[in-house]
């Protein structure tokens, strides 16, 4: 029996249980089974190879457009790496590092009104992200807490609800829509790409501030990541469709629906992400160590390894 087949037999049950838990299991799940064999298991073997070569904690950045399946992919990788390779894996989302609602309100008053809305570089607590890397890279590991963000209330959880990290992981996956994003030229920043930018950021103060953050703070943070895995969406239109599905899912999970977005709100919300998402499709499709190509029906088309 080869290693791929052995891994498949040992992880199949947990994989299908995870899909059911996430409510993405399909009764006619032939494609999902094929994805385990042809996508997730080979990717897990690649990660194991990178970890073995490195010999110390491996940091992976997983990015892709909103609703592309980053949380699903990272969850599946964690299952395979833990069950088959016996690796200690930690997954964090950059979303958990958003600034508090109050801090973003303050930014909207002192810098630009568009900073009321979370998401773009500049709305994350970069000091907490720095600590994230420092704590995980320590030779003498000490337990610590990582923040948690509640999207249904648009605010950070109180510290007593934060994630307790008690054991040093061998593999760390940081997932998020803008992980690995690069800044644009000033000439591009000046040209609005949607109605939001044209009407609400006429003097390009908001997008210039975001771009400056990418040039400095975020560039330094992303430099700490060993390899990038990029989920390439077919086009930006799919972001709206998939984000709508995410909000419906969030509504079912949440006890408080006051911050969950409707159709019109989502349409406006994704405009905040459009510029960087489109730039990332150009950049990371070429530079990421691994590229996962998605189809319009949310199934994986293929995977490419560059290292």
Regions found by a protein language model. Give the residues of each.
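Pre-Walker A adenine-sensing motif
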Residues: 41-54
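Pre-Walker A (Motif I) flank of P-loop NTPase domains
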Residues: 54-62
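Conserved lysine of the Walker
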Residues: 70
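Post-Walker A alpha-helix
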Residues: 73-74, 78
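P-loop (Walker A) phosphate-binding loop of NTP-binding proteins
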Residues: 65
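Post-Walker A helix-loop "phosphate-sensing" segment adjacent to the P-loop in P-loop NTPases
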Residues: 79-90
């Amino acid at each position: 029996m080869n290693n791929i087949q052995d891994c498949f037999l040992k992880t199949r049950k947990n994989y299908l249980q995870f899909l059911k838990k996430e409510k993405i299991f399909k009764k006619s799940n032939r494609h999902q089974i094929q994805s385990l064999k042809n996508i997730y298991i080979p990717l897990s073997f690649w990660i194991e190879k990178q970890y073995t070569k490195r010999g110390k904690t491996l940091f992976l950045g997983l990015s892709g457009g909103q609703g592309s399946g980053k949380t699903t992919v990272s969850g599946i990788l964690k299952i395979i790496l833990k069950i088959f390779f016996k690796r200690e894996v930690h997954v964090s989302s950059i979303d958990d590092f958003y600034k508090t609602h109050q801090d973003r309100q303050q930014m909207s008053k002192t810098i630009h009104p568009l900073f009321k809305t979370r998401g773009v570089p500049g709305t994350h607590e970069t000091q907490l992200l720095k600590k994230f890397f420092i704590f995980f890279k320590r030779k003498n590991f000490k337990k610590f807490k990582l923040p948690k963000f509640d999207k249904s209330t648009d605010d950070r959880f109180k510290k007593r609800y934060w994630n307790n990290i008690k054991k040093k992981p061998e593999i760390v996956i940081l997932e998020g829509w803008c992980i690995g994003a690069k800044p644009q030229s000033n000439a591009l920043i000046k040209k609005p790409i949607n109605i939001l930018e044209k009407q609400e950021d006429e003097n390009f103060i908001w997008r210039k501030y975001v771009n400056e953050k990418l040039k400095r703070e975020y560039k330094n943070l992303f430099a700490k990541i060993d390899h990038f895995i990029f989920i390439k969406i077919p086009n930006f239109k799919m972001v709206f469709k998939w984000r709508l599905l995410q909000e419906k899912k969030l509504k079912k999970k949440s006890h408080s629906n006051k911050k969950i977005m409707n159709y019109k709100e989502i349409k406006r919300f994704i405009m905040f992400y459009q510029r960087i998402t489109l730039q990332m499709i150009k950049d990371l499709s070429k530079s990421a160590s691994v590229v996962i190509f998605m189809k319009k029906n949310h199934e994986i088309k293929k995977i490419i390894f560059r290292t």
